[in-house]
Amino acid sequence: MKSTGTFRYGAHVLANGIRQHYLRYGGAEAGPPLILVPGITSPAATWGFVGERFGRTFDTYVLDVRGRGLSASGPDLDYSLDTCAKDVVALAQALRLQPYLLVGHSLGGRIAIRAARIDRQIEKLVIVDAPLSGPGRPPYPSPLDRYLTAIRLARRGASLEELRPFTPTWTEEHLRVRAEWLHTCDETAITQSHHGLQTDDIHADLAAVQQKVLFIVAGKGPLSAEAIDEVRRIAPAVLIRVVPNAGHMIPMEDIEGFMAAFDDFLGKRLDG
């Protein structure tokens, strides 16, 4: 993908008892620290093009959530929402990033909500099309088998055409990066995370968050109007913005709309 020259390096840090891997963009001279947490089967490298853009304005750290990419993985690790949220907080502490901004997409958005509830060093929170499933609510619409099938195909070296049906709206460029990294997603991690999408009460977390919150919604995504209305009821201070022409993987489908949705919420406009 076209580089803007903000990539600094990839690195590991021991935090919350595991090896955590991240990609850094921008550096301290770019602006305040910002941690970006991708979704359920999105290693950090698949969000590198977003990191490149964020790195123009912020000291950006794109995280490999445990069980993905180059972070620690394996069947014996705990992949619960609580633990993943503590990973983010521990990463920020280990890298001395406090205070910091936090952005999370999909599952990463749920991780970010839980992290914001436990860490007041998070100044502002941006949730990007996070699933609003949970106890007493409609189930998460994407079945676990779909994720595991794609991972197994990638593990055996599937072609782009074999993987394309899972992300049919993506460009070949985005699909190539996903094909390169999808095999790193640990099946135990994905299974536990998917289960948590049905059982974790993220609404209680969101209602308790004290920081300023922006919720970016995909206009063509899975979140219903009723689900968004519930967010407005339980957390009326949350600012909601819609990217009308994008599905759930918003930046892969409309990067300019994604960037524009932030406006000046983070204190500075993202340099488009």
Sequence positions of predicted segments:
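Conserved HGGG/HGGXW glycine-rich cap/lid loop of the alpha/beta-hydrolase fold
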Residues: 14, 18-73
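Conserved acidic catalytic loop of the alpha/beta-hydrolase fold
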Residues: 83-100
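Short beta-strand immediately N-terminal to the catalytic nucleophile in serine-hydrolase-like folds
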Residues: 102-104, 128
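Gly/Ala-rich beta-loop-alpha elbow adjacent to hydrolase catalytic centers
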Residues: 104, 108, 112
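Flexible "cap/lid" loop of the alpha/beta hydrolase fold
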Residues: 113-117, 121-154
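Conserved alpha/beta-hydrolase catalytic His-Asp/Glu region
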Residues: 135-142, 153-208
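Conserved loop-alpha-helix segment in the C-terminal half of the alpha/beta-hydrolase fold
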Residues: 213-246
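Catalytic histidine-centered segment of alpha/beta-hydrolase-like enzymes
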Residues: 246-259
